[in-house]
Amino acid sequence: RQNTQSSCSRSLSRFQHFVFRKDYSPLHAVGISIFHSIAAFNNAGFDNLGGMHNLIPYKDNILLNITTDVLVIVGGIGFLVLVDIVKQKSFKKLCLHSKVAISMTAVLLIGGTLILKATENITWMGAFFQSMTTRTAGFSTYNIGNFSKAGLFAMCILMFIGASPGSTGGGVKTTTIFVM
């Protein structure tokens, strides 16, 4: 299983290399893509691009947005949920914990996206990315210093909730909020 996860991370890192190689030397682009992929999976969100602009220059880059989305979501869903998905291969057969973690993740992603799209002047892709990364990863494709109070409040709620148990993300956890 670790080989599968490792292969997935390496593949997504290669996709990100295509994005960064336009702005950096080949070796630097490889380093950035590897670092960014690991940070995304681990929900770390470190800005290694300098200048405090994080991923803002890449806000319209579909490839970078999708690979980062996938890595952050997979890292934030929880190891036990991932194992359950691989073993069961059907939502109906998943254990209750996995169903709650997946359902709450979907609700938070969709709800956060709708709220951010309604409160901010950003694209749908940007609203989804910010909703996804706000919960635990901390990446940014928009300057959140320019967001409205309503948008920032929604982001604070998402940060408080965070990721699912057994994941690389923080927060009080999706299952805790579900039980409450």
Question: Regions from the language model: what does each represent?
Answer:
Residues 1-180:
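Membrane-proximal intracellular helices of multi-pass ion channels
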